[in-house]
């Protein structure tokens, strides 16, 4: 089965010590694992039992106890080209294997690795026995990576032919493998072959005088290798066919064969020779003069785990007397807590183990084999590996044609009783028998046919499952369809809760005059009302969950929204876990999303939206993405399911009453538009990263969108975005990786982004495709700079709106905010600085950028300060915020931004007087936009209309002047000023606010021609982001500094309403670039030399700059 290759590696790197071993088989021979042993740690991924020719495999081990490492070894035997994998369960030792003389020479490879906690790590690979060591060449490469005192070693091992000696010439002894004696197969043999072939498993049986057939035991071949060649070994396939066809002849030795759909591309089989006299558990059936024996269900299948390496060591499954003390069962019994697991497969299905086995605590003494053939039994075990610990884990097996897995879970804790649970697909039932104790054992028996009773629940489970009346005929439909259920479970109760809350508030208002005792009674009544509301929700959840499992046609995937209460999640888990083994109930922080499926998830990620408004402020709504393996429906196929819950519409709740403005519905729609854009980017990012498997995948987006389709316009995905993700960004990353493009400073990176029209929100995707750590640090620095600048603007906006400050006051506020920010992020010894880098910044990076952090960087224990160059970050912030410090401040910043420094750094790090110059950001980037009264735009038509109104008002003023002499003089002065400047015709008697700017646009011919083609200009970013900073039409004008030496500023200052997909991260349209060629600043009050005053007007002529 194909699976996400990075899932188990992510878990592997979380350990304090880990080893990733890669083995490349460059020979023309198969390598079969006959032993695997761990002295320390646990196996995150078990070594595959077969390494095909010209292929490579990977597995990993990790520490699983405090202050321990990982150490282990594995033995692979070289198989001749014409031989199939042997039955390792029948081999007592390597000496025993040599004595059987199956072939000559016998060559095996010993691989050892060690990543201890204290000493140096090491690895070795040897070809044994010594006299045959020159037949193959082996080499190894060991590398180590340390991250926050965690050591991760990677071992690369290569096995290839010795060119000087030529290819190994094997001599196979036929008397040990096939025909000897006289006899011919009887009719029963053919019947056995036909019946077993119909059950997807082939057994070649032979009969003769005194000949016996035995069902040998061997795990299936590994499904997890990465093949170098796209074709399988022809020797294996041809040999399998020959062995299967030889159903008659003189055979004393039986042949057992299994089907492995993961290894071969067709339903071919691989025959496994079984040594006579080893397997004693068999039932004999005679027919004529010959006999045929099929293995009983008690035949044991096992992989290997020896206790030490020598030519005569007993392998762990040996039943001889000298092998008892060194066997794996003895190792289980030595532990403080141990677990024996037995699984009997009484069905006609071949069960294949999932690549990854989960052992939460303890270590494998005997790992579970990779296959369970029909009518056979396997045994394996685990033991505790640390002080005051137990052992628990879960194993998954799947069968072709079943929609879900067989799941077996065990837990033998240090304190308390052992517990076991299981899950089986439709059409099967499992019987369980267990023995409790320090060394507990459990036996699972898999039978065909639906069970008449509900599976037994785990003893002492915190969520016992009550008996539910279900019809045994209610089964999942076994076809090629997938049934999905999506529902908002809180849609009704939210309204009920709002009404109850309003009643509570009304009661509070009516009883304000009561004494304190009455208030206490009132608070109790409020608590009771909230408790009753929770009970109503839980009752509804209980009913919904029971209906889901009692449907005549059960759903394969269940997606719910607004499951906020923990008690509701517990009810859903309690009722659904019987039929849905894969449940994800913890998704983000208070997101309300719930996922249950019969298909195993391969990838799961949650993307939280930016802060909502109204009642959504207290929730962490977002979108959840899950990649499901639906190979049981169609081979090698996947399903991407995205579950989202968008901004709710306004209601009469208190939270919505606190939202300013009258057009609350439009504000909610605007937030939903941004959330849909976030969903689009989230999906596009994942599909771009999984481009290799996207051809075999399907995608589904469900959830509660709260959209009014008749009014709202949903953003459609533009072709330019897909081109940016699939072509432009990968090409840029390729050029940077090959050093065709060299980037040293941040401004160079921004220039490439602007030239290629790559939005800032795609910086995370670009970083995920870079290989050089220096370039990754540079991109991460720009993302952090963008977030810090955005946070500063938000703080400035809040203070400006709170105090209704003017420009002079804003400059002082801005200075204080910038100073506070620099003292926070560069003072590494402060606790709030550590909190910022480890929690706040990581959360903001996830919300603003897709795939911004790697798997390791997403962990809470990773300090992002080690991934950023402090001088580069300071320089980027300095240019972005337009601030200049004196040399002493720069020295203090570099001194304070040292990790683990023992020097005492003063607080604050820098002082206000150390700022030499600071430029206030554009006014429209932080001014309030609810009423949009801070900025007034005037065109020719607007000016004429305003002039007509002014003339009427001037006539009224002239009449008043005739009555009062003082008013007449003021009116005459205003008329003289109106002839000087066109702007002064605006009503001067109108009381203007401190933050009111009036801009008059005198249109040019180029501008009018462009209007005929593109329509009227609008502030697109301000329209779609009413609560976010953005550029407006006067961006390049409101910051002009009138100095002779200053170069005239050119900027994107006008937006045409083309498409929401156009425009960069600050809302500027990159298709049209305008420059201001003529300006006339008309002071209406005191005007500072370096800044525009509180009251002013601009008369500007805009010309379109042709590219």
From Swiss-Prot:
Protein name stated in the entry: Uncharacterized protein DDB_G0272682
Region (Disordered): 180-251, 501-530
Disulfide feature: none
Record keyword Amino-acid biosynthesis present: no
Record-level Gene Ontology MF annotations: phospholipase activity; sphingomyelin phosphodiesterase activity
GO cellular component: cytoplasm
Gene source species: Dictyostelium discoideum (Social amoeba)
InterPro entries attached to this UniProt entry: Endo/exonu/phosph_ase_sf, Sph/SMPD2-like
Residue ranges the record marks as coiled coil: 789-816, 940-1012
Entry keyword annotation includes Disulfide bond: no
Ranges of compositional bias, category Low complexity: 180-204, 238-251, 501-521
Compositional bias ranges of the Gly residues kind: 205-215
Biased segments, Polar residues type: 219-237
């Amino acid at each position: 089965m194909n699976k996400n290759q990075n899932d188990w590696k992510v878990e592997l790197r979380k350990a304090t010590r880990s080893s990733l071993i890669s083995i490349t088989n460059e020979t023309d021979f198969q390598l079969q694992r006959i032993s695997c042993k761990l002295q320390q740690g646990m196996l995150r991924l078990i070594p595959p039992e077969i390494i095909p020719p010209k292929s490579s495999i990977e597995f990993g081990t990790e520490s699983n106890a405090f202050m321990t490492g990982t150490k282990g070894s594995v033995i692979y035997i070289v198989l001749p080209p014409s031989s199939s994998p042997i039955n390792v369960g029948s081999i007592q030792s390597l000496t025993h294997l040599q004595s059987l003389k199956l072939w000559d020479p016998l060559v095996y490879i010993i691989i050892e690795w060690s990543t201890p906690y204290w000493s140096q790590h090491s690895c070795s690979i040897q070809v044994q026995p010594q006299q045959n060591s020159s037949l193959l060449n082996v080499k190894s490469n060991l590398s180590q990576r340390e991250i926050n005192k965690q050591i991760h070693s990677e071992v690369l091992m290569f096995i290839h032919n010795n060119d000087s000696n030529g290819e190994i010439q094997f001599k196979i002894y036929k008397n040990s493998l096939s025909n000897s004696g006289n006899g011919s197969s009887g009719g029963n043999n053919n019947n056995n072959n036909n019946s077993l072939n119909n059950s997807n498993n082939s057994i070649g049986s032979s009969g003769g005088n005194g000949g016996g057939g035995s069902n040998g035991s061997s795990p299936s071949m590994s499904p997890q290798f990465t093949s170098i060649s796209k074709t399988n070994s022809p020797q294996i396939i041809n040999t399998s066919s020959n062995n299967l066809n030889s159903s008659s002849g003189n055979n004393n030795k039986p042949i057992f064969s299994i089907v492995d759909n993961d290894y071969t591309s067709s339903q071919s089989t691989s025959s496994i020779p079984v040594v006579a006299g080893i397997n004693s558990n068999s039932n004999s059936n005679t027919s004529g003069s010959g006999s045929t024996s099929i293995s009983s269900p008690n035949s044991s299948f096992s992989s290997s785990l020896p206790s030490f390496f020598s030519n005569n060591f007993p392998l762990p499954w040996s039943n001889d007397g000298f092998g008892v003390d060194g066997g794996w069962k003895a190792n289980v019994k030595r532990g403080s807590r141990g677990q024996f697991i037995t699984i009997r497969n009484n069905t006609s299905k071949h069960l294949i183990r999932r690549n990854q086995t989960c052992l939460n605590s303890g270590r494998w003494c005997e790992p579970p084999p990779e296959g369970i053939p029909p009518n056979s039994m396997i045994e394996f075990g685990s033991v505790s590996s640390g002080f005051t610990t137990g052992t628990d884990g879960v194993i998954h097996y799947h069968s072709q044609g079943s929609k879900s897995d067989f799941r077996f879970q065990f837990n033998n804790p240090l304190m308390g009783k052992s517990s076991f649970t299981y899950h089986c697909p439709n059409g099967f039932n499992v019987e369980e028998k267990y023995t409790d104790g320090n060394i507990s054992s459990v036996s699972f028996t898999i039978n065909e046919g639906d069970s008449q009773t509900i599976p037994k629940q785990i003893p002492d489970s915190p969520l016992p499952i009550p008996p539910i009346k279900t019809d045994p005929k209610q089964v999942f439909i076994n076809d090629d369809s997938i049934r999905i259920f999506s529902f908002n479970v809180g849609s009704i109760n939210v309204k009920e809760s709002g009404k109850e809350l309003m009643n509570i508030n009304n009661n509070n208002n009516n009883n304000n005059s009561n004494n304190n005792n009455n208030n206490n009674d009132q608070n109790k009544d409020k608590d009771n009302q909230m408790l009753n509301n929770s009970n109503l929700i839980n009752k509804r959840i209980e009913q919904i969950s029971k209906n889901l499992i009692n449907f005549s046609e059960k759903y394969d995937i269940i997606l719910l929204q607004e499951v906020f209460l923990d008690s509701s999640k517990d009810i859903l888990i309690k009722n659904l876990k019987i039929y849905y083994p894969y449940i994800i109930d913890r998704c983000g922080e208070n997101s309300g999303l719930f996922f249950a499926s019969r298909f195993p998830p391969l990838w799961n990620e949650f993307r939280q939206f930016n802060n909502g408004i109204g009642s959504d402020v207290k929730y962490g709504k977002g979108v959840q993405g899950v990649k499901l393996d639906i190979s049981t429906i169609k081979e090698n196929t996947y399903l991407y399911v995205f579950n989202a819950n968008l901004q709710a519409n306004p209601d009469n709740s208190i939270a919505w009453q606190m939202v300013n403005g009258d057009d609350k519905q439009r504000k909610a729609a605007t937030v939903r538009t941004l959330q849909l854009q976030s969903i689009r980017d989230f999906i596009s990012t994942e599909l771009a990263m999984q481009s290799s498997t996207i051809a075999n995948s399907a995608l589904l987006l469900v959830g509660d969108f709260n959209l009014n389709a008749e009014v709202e316009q949903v953003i459609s995905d533009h072709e330019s975005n897909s081109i940016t993700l699939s072509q432009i960004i990968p090409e840029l990353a390729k050029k940077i990786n090959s050093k065709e493009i060299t980037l040293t400073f941040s401004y160079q990176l921004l220039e490439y982004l602007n030239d290629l029209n790559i939005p800032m929100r795609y910086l995370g995707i670009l970083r995920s495709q870079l290989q050089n750590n220096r370039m990754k640090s540079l991109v991460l620095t720009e993302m952090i700079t963008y977030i810090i600048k955005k946070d500063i603007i938000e703080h400035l906006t809040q203070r400006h709106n709170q105090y209704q400050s003017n420009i002079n006051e804003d400059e002082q506020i801005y200075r204080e905010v910038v100073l506070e920010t620099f003292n926070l992020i560069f003072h590494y010894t402060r606790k709030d600085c550590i909190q910022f880098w480890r929690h706040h910044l990581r959360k903001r990076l996830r919300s603003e950028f897709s795939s911004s952090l790697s798997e390791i960087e997403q962990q809470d224990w990773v300090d992002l300060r080690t991934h950023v160059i402090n001088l580069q970050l300071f320089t980027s912030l300095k240019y972005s915020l337009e601030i200049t410090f004196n040399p002493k401040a720069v020295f203090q910043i570099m001194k304070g931004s040292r990790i683990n420094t023992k020097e005492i750094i003063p607080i604050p790090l820098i002082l206000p007087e150390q700022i030499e110059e600071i430029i206030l950001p554009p006014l429209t980037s932080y001014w309030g936009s609810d009423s949009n009264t801070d900025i007034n735009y005037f065109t020719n038509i607007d000016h004429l209309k305003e002039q007509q109104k002014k003339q009427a008002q001037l006539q009224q003023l002239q009449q008043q002047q005739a009555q009062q002499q003082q008013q007449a003089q003021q009116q005459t002065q205003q008329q003289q000023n109106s002839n000087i400047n066109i702007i002064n015709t605006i009503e001067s008697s109108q009381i203007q606010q401190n933050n009111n700017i009036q801009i008059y646009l005198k249109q040019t011919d180029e501008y009018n021609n462009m209007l005929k083609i593109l329509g009227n200009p609008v502030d697109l970013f301000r329209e779609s982001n009413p609560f976010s900073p953005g550029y407006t039409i006067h961006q390049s004008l409101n910051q002009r500094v009138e100095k002779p030496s200053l170069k005239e500023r050119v900027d994107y200052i006008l937006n045409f309403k083309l498409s929401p997909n156009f425009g960069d991260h600050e809302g500027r349209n990159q298709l049209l670039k305008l420059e201001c060629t003529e300006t006339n600043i008309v002071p209406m009050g005191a005007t500072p030399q370096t800044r525009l005053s509180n009251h002013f007007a601009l008369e500007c002529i805009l010309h379109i700059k042709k590219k």
